């Protein structure tokens, strides 16, 4: 192993050479070998002994990860690789493959410019491969491909070389189909991977070898020599030693990374315009486009880690321009406050090496600041110390919404303040976790992406932060909407001196999906539109709205839209903000069961306002608009939607009957069944309400041999025969009237 001092010195020397930096992530489906690959890359860079690689799981910094044998939290590590006589700094982030931790992938891809996509030779492309690659491409991250577990083809499946080549070609075609589908238009062809040009490598992370065409051409080492070692070696240890000598994995993969993935200098030219919507001709825009270390400092936090004993927070951040220095004062644009950066460091796995400064293009660790959140933009103050007038980077978007909620309380009521503090800390680390305190009942609700997500949060509260808790059974989050359209419906203020006229209609499905995609890409803002501009108008018109409608769009909230279509109403400008607040309140709590609304277009078409401002304050305007929206929704035909998960179940063929019966017993529908010799893939749709406890039931139905993966999440109307029962359950739980209308 290289001594820490030597490694630290080499890292520091390279931090000022942006052309020699590669910020990369390893992304893949769960259990396809990402973390083992990471360990072997570290061993090759001299940061982990070769004997330990693969067993050490260097980036698994949380005991939950070791127990479950999967990466939950994206860890960061810096290492040095020599290529063609020059040193390169590789900043690497290991990301989870389990879909319930997809938020970690979303945040990690903001920090990186390139990704090594790992695909299992036997499994091929799986649902999460598609999800994580889609997330990376959406953030303008360039991929290369590593096909792992080729050792299984030789030892286990005993495939002849021509069959192995056929399978490799199949995987390459599949990955390129995904790149064609999800890559930005200008990179659809440029970013396709190819065995010939060296953007594809294949090998075994377990046995620590890899091959690529450039490596084979350079060394004369080929598949034949590897197969020979497998056929003659006495045991796995001998295989590892001998293949390492002729085709070391780290050299082949990191050579591919250096040669084919972009430096920050190159990547920021096309990434900054997509991720930051400020003036590219300003001093900030120019500095970020060039990754200029002498420009004003701008960095973005992509993750916050909380130490379970000291509660100290460490933020992982990408420096986009300028130089971040220890002890410097900076502005946090989202939090709107000035703070001092106490410590700056780089990661060596879990360990931090303290440094004095970090220049543009680097991934760093910042400690000693309590107000950093994932997605925060850090900016150097203006020369007079004031806050720069620039927008923050666009918010980091997550593909799936939280759909499962639990009520949580401390066993000992005296631990309540501690529990609230712990939840705030965990939420900083994991923004996909939603924490709400019901203002009326005082009940604390935590919402996550599924059963497993909440289980891990509970484990951390109990074991890391030592708070004993009681949790309720999981509760599913529903959505409210309408069947058709209605209005204008009148809403009167309590003093009867103001009237508002509202129409409500269901968003057409095609429009809804296009809107969702634009929100995920950051092309449209979420919330009140503070400043309408030509870009927003164009994106709204591309959804099918007229120019006039687009100009009058005031709010996009929870995938619902609000338009002010009034003309010539005196004083409307003074109350429109309250009208928007009322709209957002109803979108948070709909009329059926106080669940959030989805897919609605709400328009204010007319209003009659009292001339005296004292008679049209929030206490008059907000109830009137709320009433009008809820009555219009009722007239348009109320619908309750439930979250439905599209899943893929992977089982031996003998269990197809048991699994289809299990899915059918949970109101599921089979969409597709594909069978191979030793496995069957069953694609199905199952309501989230019925998915609770599914993992354990599947395990017992298949003698522990069945696993399932989340492919997608959609909302579908609750069946008519269950509507009354579900509404009653929700209302009862929330302490709402069981039969009366909630308006």
Curated annotation (Swiss-Prot):
Q: Sorted alphabetically, which Pfam families does this protein's record hold?
A: EFG_C, EFG_III, EFG_IV, GTP_EFTU, GTP_EFTU_D2
UniProt cross-references to InterPro entries, sorted A to Z: EFG_II, EFG_III/V, EFG_V-like, EFTu-like_2, P-loop_NTPase, Ribosomal_Su5_D2-typ_SF, Ribsml_uS5_D2-typ_fold_subgr, Small_GTP-bd
- Which CDD domains does this chain map to? aeEF2_snRNP_like_IV, EF2, EF2_II, EF2_snRNP_III, Elongation_Factor_C
The entry assigns this protein to a family as follows:
Belongs to the TRAFAC class translation factor GTPase superfamily. Classic translation factor GTPase family. EF-G/EF-2 subfamily.
Q: Which GO terms describe its molecular function?
A: GTP binding; GTPase activity; translation elongation factor activity
For the keyword Cell wall biogenesis/degradation, the answer is: no
What name does UniProt use for this protein?
A: Elongation factor 2
Q: Which residues bind GTP?
A: 28-35, 94-98, 148-151
Residue numbers carrying Diphthamide: 615
Principal place of residence: cytoplasm
Q: Could you tell me which residue ranges the tr-type G domain spans?
A: 19-265
Which locations, inside or outside the cell, does it occupy? Answer: Cytoplasm
**What taxonomic lineage is listed for the species of origin?**
Archaea, Nanobdellota, Candidatus Nanoarchaeia, Nanoarchaeales, Nanoarchaeaceae
Instruction: Give me the gene this protein comes from.
Output: fusA
What job does the chain carry out?
Catalyzes the GTP-dependent ribosomal translocation step during translation elongation. During this step, the ribosome changes from the pre-translocational (PRE) to the post-translocational (POST) state as the newly formed A-site-bound peptidyl-tRNA and P-site-bound deacylated tRNA move to the P and E sites, respectively. Catalyzes the coordinated movement of the two tRNA molecules, the mRNA and conformational changes in the ribosome.
User: Highest taxon of the source?
Assistant: Archaea
Which cellular component appears as one GO term in the record? ribonucleoprotein complex
Keyword terms: Cytoplasm, Elongation factor, GTP-binding, Nucleotide-binding, Protein biosynthesis
